[in-house]
Amino acid sequence: MENDILNEELNDTATFTPTDDERFAEKAIIKVIGVGGGGGNAVNYMYKQQIPLVRYVVLNTDKQALGTMDVPDKIILGYDITQGQGAGNNPEVGRQCAEASVDDIKKLFDKDTEMVFITAGMGGGTGTGAAPVVAKLAKDAGMLTIGIVTVPFQFESEQKILTALDGAKEMQQYVDALLVINNENLTTLYPDISLFNCFEKADDTLANAARSISEIISEKCFINVDFQDVKTTLKDSGTAIISSGEGEGENRVTKAIENALKSPLLKAHDIKTSKRLLMKFSCARECENPITAKELNEITVFTSSLPKTVKVKWGIADIPEMEDRIKVTILASGFDVTLRDGEDKGDGPITFSSEDNAQKSKKPEKPDTDKEAAIETTYGTGTMKQMALNR
């Protein structure tokens, strides 16, 4: 079939043999799979970072987009359906294309793979429709399966936002943990970002989330956190978040933690409502001011402020380039989430809010109110009014 020929042209993904690129570990226990345009761009960005223990794969219905990727391992989805022309922003077409390529996708989940990241931008056709199919196949194969997805900027239209939230809800059914990055929060982080750069920044943010978790596993720690700690934190955990922050000078450990927790990317979550918390501190052993035992008390002060229901594990990695700075990466999981109306278990987008926010949600009196609640919970009060003004 022509689909097989195209796969061979892009890469011999049908057998998933190692490529000639020797930058990565021979036994890669982590696979990072980018689905669709946004997911593919994020994985292409990660591929250039040379993270050990990781292999990368990009999947798309768009042959031309795949051709621009540096990642050697590629699968074109559903060629017989779209002839490589993309899903046309139709998630149903994206789903059908993934289902038509199930045999190729299954071959990605070999015996050496222990953890799979699936990255996608929600709201379009391929990412929204195909990513949940890929996630289900990974989970069914026994992989620790993590979804990392973005939802659109506010200016991208109400319909695209609702499509994205539907896709995220579908994705959540088939992963151990789902990290949702709201692109609109990037406008707080980068208030002067140009329209031409905002989508690139969204792809970078998607990549950084997957990279941060991968680095927890791959970087050697002298107070250890490892793959099993990540697995314990994320296995069947529902919704998760990841953030990082840096500190320097006096109270640098506390500053790093505070900066991580102040990230707009954590906007909808209170760390105290999580069930598991994994923290990795990165600092230089050989520097002018190496971390002291006294500074570790700053970690204890923070962890002691959390409810006893939050299970905490932390470690320290020696990263020479940090010099006198300290960086913390925080991975938290097990947040209580609610469907958009708080009760209905039927079809519809999910909102990703902490238990505190969930208690404030009310069942809508009409379907349109349900949609409005989904958007307002995810994007903030007043969003619908602002979107109406922008029309």
Language-model features: where?
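Tubulin/FtsZ superfamily GTPase core signature
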Residues: 1-391
